Amino acid sequence: MTTERPDAGDSGSEKPDETAAPDPAANGARRSKTRLAARSLGHGFGDGAVLEDISLAVEPGEILAVVGPSGTGKTTLFRLLAMFERPDEGTVEVGGDDVWDLPEARRLAVRRRVGMAFQTRSLFSTTVEENVSYGLRVRRSWSARVRDAVEGLFGRDEPSETVRDALRTVGMFDKVGRDAGSLSAGEAQRVAIARALAPDPDVLLLDEPTSNLDPRNTAAIESAMRAARDRGIAVALATHDMQQARRVSDRTAVILGGTCIESGPTDAVFESPDDDRVRQFVEGKLVY
């Protein structure tokens, strides 16, 4: 059973720098975002349960860290949240709708409002620009607005402003014309995150996005998470790095043994957890 902690204190002519991250204030006209929630999720493979009775939510304009040791079901949870698989039990809700109760066409439209970058960095053998543009090109089959925005994208001499913004957010605009195959692992992950951000999702799911990366790339990705949050995107981060969770997240959910046993404001979860197992885990005394 999850212990939910209440939030504490609810309360000139100069040429622009092309590599600078976009100003969140400039995005005031963006449509409002929606929340993503899981209710009593259960899922397994064969006879074994991987997840049991998981309930959590990520709100627009916040970063939720889902922490737990490797192999505890975080990736499976994120695949369910991204609607790649249907849960055996419980519901996934976007904007209050149970996505698996929606007609298929509506569910696919809702799915496209959720961006995800996996721990395994998979890019196409094209340029950085074309990789980031991919998500927009997929969307044009169902959205006239996006279709008009990206029509002829690959034939342009300059990348679209949408692609520019996404690459600025992850600090990769200077690599826009590079072949993706020439990037380092950290640079490739940053491009994958830019690709997830380009369609302006309501929700961004990041599964261990900085695993085995150097400090420079880790810092750039953490900066991108904060920028996405400042744009009103609901950001969920799966990580076993508790220090990272403390640096970037507003709230934290702790997964142990396939169950969410505590969630709440990050400082409260780490400094005064209600569950003894969480206390032992954050102190490095509990091993799964």
From Swiss-Prot:
It comes from the Archaea. Residues 1-18 have a biased composition (Basic and acidic residues). It is a peripheral membrane protein. It comes from Haloferax volcanii (strain ATCC 29605 / DSM 3757 / JCM 8879 / NBRC 14742 / NCIMB 2012 / VKM B-1768 / DS2). This is Probable anion import ATP-binding protein HVO_1886. The complex is composed of two ATP-binding proteins (HVO_1886), two transmembrane proteins (HVO_1887) and a solute-binding protein (HVO_1888). Its EC number is 7.3.2.-. GO terms for molecular function: ATP binding; ATP hydrolysis activity; phosphate transmembrane transporter activity.
